[in-house]
Amino acid sequence: MDRSGSSDFAGAAATTGRSNPAPWSDDKESPNNEDDSNEDDGDHTTPAKVTDPLAPKLANNERILVVSVTERTRETWGQKAEFLLAVIGFAVDLGNVWRFPYICYQNGGGAFLVPYCLFLIFGGLPLFYMELALGQFHRCGCLSIWKRICPALKGVGYAICLIDIYMGMYYNTIIGWAVYYLFASFTSKLPWTSCDNPWNTENCMQVTSENFTELATSPAKEFFERKVLESYKGNGLDFMGPVKPTLALCVFGVFVLVYFSLWKGVRSAGKVVWVTALAPYVVLIILLVRGVSLPGADEGIKYYLTPEWHKLKNSKVWIDAASQIFFSLGPGFGTLLALSSYNKFNNNCYRDALITSSINCLTSFLAGFVIFSVLGYMAYVQKTSIDKVGLEGPGLVFIVYPEAIATMSGSVFWSIIFFLMLITLGLDSTFGGLEAMITALCDEYPRVIGRRRELFVLLLLAFIFLCALPTMTYGGVVLVNFLNVYGPGLAILFVVFVEAAGVFWFYGVDRFSSDVEQMLGSKPGLFWRICWTYISPVFLLTIFIFSIMGYKEMLGEEYYYPDWSYQVGWAVTCSSVLCIPMYIIYKFFFASKGGCRQRLQESFQPEDNCGSVVPGQQGTSV
């Protein structure tokens, strides 16, 4: 699929040290060296016209770059839709289903949408757009990109990779829970519909019973805690117990699915996302139609949407809105950089940012209707108020919703499609997080890793699976929540703040805007430049400060964490955060030469031999 003829060398291009030079001019190979018939870069055997703003400028004493076809190309998405589905699939995750509806009704219902939309426009969307543009322009992952922006901040890339490992350790376990439920649903009677099972206790009681009290536990709750997790056999972090084999097998199956989706890069992932990104929407619509037809659904939806304007006076509402937008869109995890790096150079990433971020937020809103229609139904069945039915987090989708499904006709069918939806939502997000790390390391170490992607992905997933084994123990559910807070929860906020500062303050908004102009033909408007320079960094710093102040609240109140666990948690957080200052020290004192001024220049200015990755101007210096 050679686009430039059958010759081994497509031609030659000349460039100066600063005029769009080769991205791998330090003799590294392109990590994705397969030809790609889908990228229409034109025939580069003929020199570009001088009037072309992307054309290399010819001058005396320039070194000649021989552009090899295999080194000039980078694998691209088979279709534009594959990229959009991959981004949507990453952004729309389990949190859209179990977190947004809860914090929406908790923080004023319809009134919550005011700060939510404001933070989307002024905070989340500018960062989302930034990462898509950066990845598409520089066409590399979160490690290699920093030599073209601010070399001293390469530690941001290592921090992101470490955070992605922490996420892989617990997030796939949550998907494993859904897999367990899925297999348990293939029966004539759902196992959480009655209290006559071996794992039930004497406190078990049907939620529809008139004798149901606060001391009683529902069959669905006992199934989750005593059958799926068997958490009663452990004692939290103090004694987690052995690994539960059936749960470990479910999580292992998740890792197998992830491997065969990622081992070939965007060629394999691009095909998988057609199922994993679209299936949740089909199921959501089916569940919505079923939910609104249930008795009491209208009360649930009314509870969800009724605005309580007085709550907007509470600062917590605004902080929750900012946090939800940030973690929902997912900037800073390296995923948007990685996925957009496989786009064509002139792809309209601005339009993509608007489309995908809007779909993400609308999906959260739609999920609220699905959840609250069922919560209204459960309140009707139990003859109680909705606020006594709902739970936040995993309990909502693994206890309350299965509880509701068990009371419906055709409960087996509804259970199967619901947990299939959770699995596909989770898989898309874990694809994105792991692909960010894989792309980054393949780009940074192309000779060692890039050539052996299949083997590297296998070893990486095996390593993460082994590290995740403690989350599959009897006390693993506590560790899952612990890692969620201390792994990415706090660290990613600081990391993204430094990333934004590096791009907008060191690299410069003007230079970044010029990069966007090369791709799209026009510079970003004043609104975007103001957001990038001032509003977005303040947005990130504010969330980070308030998250540190309320980190114990993030852990929840269902389990009392021992004192030593807080020290371990902060060590986990610092392990990724410290990558940034440690690399700055390394770059300044050990990887730079000359006096203090020259070292600062080498550390905080883009390297001379690294510039924009313009199609047809990549190659190996000779």
Curated annotation (Swiss-Prot):
For this protein, the record's CDD domains field holds: SLC6sbd_SERT-like
Intrachain disulfide bonds? 195-204
InterPro entries annotated for this entry? Answer: Na/ntran_symport (IPR000175), SNS_sf (IPR037272)
Q: Name one Pfam family in it.
A: SNF
Which tissues does it occur in? Answer: Expression is specific to cell bodies in the ventral ganglion of the embryonic and larval nervous system.
**How does the protein associate with the membrane?**
Multi-pass membrane protein
User: Primary place of residence?
Assistant: membrane
Q: Which residues lie on this side of the membrane: Extracellular?
A: 176-244
Topological domain ranges for the Cytoplasmic compartment? 1-82, 587-622
Which stretches are transmembrane?
Answer: 83-103, 111-130, 155-175, 245-263, 272-289, 325-342, 354-375, 408-427, 455-473, 489-509, 530-549, 568-586
Keyword list, A-Z: Cell membrane, Disulfide bond, Glycoprotein, Membrane, Metal-binding, Neurotransmitter transport, Sodium, Symport, Transmembrane, Transmembrane helix, Transport
Give the Acidic residues compositional bias ranges: 32-42
Q: Which residues are noted as glycosylation sites?
A: 211
Source taxon at top rank: Eukaryota
The residues that the entry says bind Na(+) 2 are: 91, 96, 328, 360
Coiled-coil stretches: none
List localization entries: Cell membrane
**Record-level GO cellular component terms:** axon; axon terminus; neuron projection; plasma membrane; synapse
Function, as annotated, reads: Terminates the action of serotonin by its high affinity sodium-dependent reuptake into presynaptic terminals.
Additional note from the record = This protein is the target of psychomotor stimulants such as amphetamines or cocaine.
Q: PANTHER family under this entry?
A: SODIUM-DEPENDENT SEROTONIN TRANSPORTER, SODIUM/CHLORIDE DEPENDENT TRANSPORTER
What family does the Swiss-Prot or TrEMBL record give for this protein? Belongs to the sodium:neurotransmitter symporter (SNF) (TC 2.A.22) family.
NCBIfam families of this UniProt entry? Na_transp
Q: What is this protein called?
A: Sodium-dependent serotonin transporter
Species annotation:
Drosophila melanogaster
